[in-house]
Swiss-Prot record:
Domain of life: Bacteria
Similarity comment: family membership: Belongs to the bacterial ribosomal protein bL9 family.
Compositional bias of kind Low complexity: 157-167
Biased composition (Basic and acidic residues): 168-177
Keywords noted in UniProt: Ribonucleoprotein, Ribosomal protein, RNA-binding, rRNA-binding
InterPro entries per record: Ribosomal_bL9, Ribosomal_bL9/RNase_H1_N, Ribosomal_bL9_bac/chp, Ribosomal_bL9_C, Ribosomal_bL9_C_sf, Ribosomal_bL9_N, Ribosomal_bL9_N_sf
Pfam families given in the database record: Ribosomal_L9_C, Ribosomal_L9_N
Gene3D superfamilies in alphabetical order: Ribosomal protein L9, C-terminal domain, Ribosomal protein L9, N-terminal domain
Region annotated Disordered, chain positions: 151-177
Protein name, UniProt field: Large ribosomal subunit protein bL9
Role of this protein: Binds to the 23S rRNA.
Amino acid sequence: MELILRADVENLGRLGDKVSVKPGYGRNYLIPQGLAMLATPANLRRFENESKKLQAKRDALIADAKGLADRLAEIAIVIEVRVGEGAKLYGSVTTAIIADKLAELGFDIDRKKIVLAEPIRSLGHYDVPVKLLPELRGSVKVSVVRQGGPEDEEIAEAAPVAEAQAEADGHSTEETA
């Protein structure tokens, strides 16, 4: 089935492309969703008339996405997690958690657009890509910290230093306790 795309469709084509798809996909999804129309001579002429409007709409969409990418680059999300021994997370930080944090900040981004190869399972700072359009990606800074705030991290970082210093002085931390 030959169709003309009226919008960008992931893994298929871009606005204005003439594509060949299976009849069921075209009839049951692309055409009813307004993403494509049959590639008949009449529709080709109609599409040429609509293409200027659609291209203007697409340009506006790209401009909005670039603005969103700039705003995302400016923010940093802090996610507090419970941590066990050895700084190992209980569970993991997933795209859904990141999307919820973005929603709290007023960004309406679907979790499927957040790109993580695998969930985050350790403390640290991450630069997480967000797919805004097929050809445009933004990124958001995500910091995964120990629940209870940075004070706990400072205490945890200070403890090995105190133990090393006590051992250097000839005292064991276990003997004093």
